[in-house]
């Protein structure tokens, strides 16, 4: 079985973070890594959103996302950042990849991803949009890409 983790960098909304914990359980992601200003468990006021999945999904917190990304790369994880970028590949291409170790990177919707994170990424993933908006809610985007993994 693949080793799948997701890294959330400075995501502001607790509801989105806890929704991603719930998505992680559904999509067989074994760990959620929280970095920067992302809120961390335990939070009884919001645990219902995740159906308490934060109690059994492993999670770690790092103040610096680069520290853990570099560690994951040394451990042979492929880093996939989700971002609209000239180097982006369509998320559906993930269905055809057979990587054993993957880490999805999601970030604050307003501040966008840090360029250094993009530079450390093995692939940059995009979810094509049909109309005028160029972004999705972070928990929705995470769910779509997690499904493709």
Model-predicted regions and their roles:
Residues 1-149:
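Post-transcriptional modification and biogenesis factors for structured RNAs
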